[in-house]
C-alpha cells in the first residue's frame, strides 16, 4: 500500500473546509516535500501512517496535503501543483517543510508546528493543544 493512501488525505482546501463544516472537524494542513525532505518523510512514517494517528484523525481531523515533490516520477498534475502553490503563497510564505497548520472549520489558524520527535499519542496531544 502506498503511503499516500495510508491516511485519508484531501488535496483541495475548499473541499476539506466543506467536509470539516459538515462533520464539525478540525483541519490539519500539511506542507510536505515527500521525496526530499527528511523530517517530512519521518513525520509521514512515524505519525501520519501510524494506526493510532489514523484512527484518531478519521474521527477528529480533515487532513489536507500540499506536497512539493522534486523527483520526476512523483510529479504532480499541473492543476494540483497550482493549488499547492496557491496554498503556499497564502499559508507558507517562508517555505517551511514540513509545516503543519491546525485550522478550525472556518480556516482560522489555531496553531502551526512541524516535525517533533513524539509518539503518535504525543503528536495528537500536541495538535490538540492548539484547539483547546
Predicted regions and their residues:
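Non-catalytic, surface beta->alpha helical segment in thiol-disulfide oxidoreductase systems
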Residues: 89-90, 94-132
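Solvent-exposed loop/turn segments at secondary-structure junctions
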Residues: 34-37, 47, 68-72, 95, ...
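Typically the conserved alpha-helix immediately C-terminal to a functionally engaged Cys/Sec
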Residues: 40-56
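C-type cytochrome heme c attachment motif
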Residues: 35-42, 98-101
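Bacterial Sec-dependent N-terminal signal peptides
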Residues: 1-8
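A short beta-strand-turn-helix
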Residues: 9-27, 57
Amino acid at each position: 500500500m502506498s503511503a499516500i493512501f495510508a491516511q485519508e488525505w484531501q488535496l483541495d482546501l475548499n473541499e476539506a473546509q466543506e467536509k470539516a463544516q459538515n462533520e464539525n472537524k478540525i483541519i490539519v494542513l500539511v506542507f510536505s516535500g515527500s521525496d526530499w525532505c527528511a523530517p517530512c518523510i519521518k513525520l509521514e512514517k512515524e505519525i501520519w501512517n501510524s494506526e493510532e494517528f489514523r484512527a484518531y484523525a478519521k474521527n477528529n481531523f480533515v487532513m489536507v496535503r500540499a506536497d512539493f515533490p522534486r523527483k520526476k516520477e512523483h510529479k504532480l498534475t499541473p492543476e494540483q501543483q497550482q493549488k499547492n502553490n496557491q496554498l503556499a503563497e497564502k499559508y507558507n510564505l517562508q517555505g517551511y517543510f514540513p509545516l503543519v497548520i491546525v485550522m478550525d472549520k472556518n480556516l482560522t489558524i489555531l496553531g502551526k508546528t512541524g516535525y517533533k520527535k513524539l509518539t503518535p499519542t504525543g503528536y495528537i496531544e500536541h495538535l490538540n493543544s492548539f484547539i483547546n
